[in-house]
Amino acid sequence: MKLGFIGTGALTSAIVTGLKSAADNSVPVLLSPRNEEVAASLALRYPDVRVAPDNQAVLDNCDTVMLAVRPQIARGVLAGLQFRRDHHVVSLIATLSREEIAALIAPVEHVTKALPMPMIAHRQGATIICPHNRRMAAFFGRLGKV
């Protein structure tokens, strides 16, 4: 898995921190430069976390992409991006439905909605995923309950 994040705020920070503190933390991570301070801090803390020059570079270099932007800017951020059919996109945007996200990121075939909580940084708490996806259940299962 080559994991990328579009949006670099508290939730992205929590997921990356939980992932990198797990026993098997070999998943490379590519962050969007959206929040320079958070992105730079994570890249300094973890050697296999890098900051991309822009959001499109995240998409071009990753097969799994988590959307972690605020709902009010999501449509604008996603509008100019070129997604691939083979991307697996995980939307962390609570107020947009899976169907709304799928329409914004066509031609992506695999869209999962996930709702983790910030305590995922400590590998605690539960993450709701919909629809059930074994790969994402295994990923989030390393960070808490699914």
Regions found by a protein language model. Name each.
Residues 1-53, 61:
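NAD(P)+-binding Rossmann beta1-loop-alpha1 motif at the extreme N-terminus of oxidoreductases
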Residues 29-34, 89-91, 127-131:
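Short, hydrophobic beta-strand segments that form beta-sheet elements in well-ordered domains
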Residues 100-110, 125-146:
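Internal alpha-helical scaffold of NAD(P)-dependent oxidoreductase catalytic cores
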Residues 30, 52, 90, 112-114, ...:
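Hydrophobic/aromatic beta-strand patches that form the interior of the parallel beta-sheet core
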Residues 39-40, 120-124:
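A short acidic, helix-capping loop that chelates divalent metal ions and anchors anionic groups
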Residues 51-105:
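Rossmann-fold NAD(P) dinucleotide-binding segment
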Residues 34-38, 95-97, 131-134:
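Short, polar loop motifs at secondary-structure junctions
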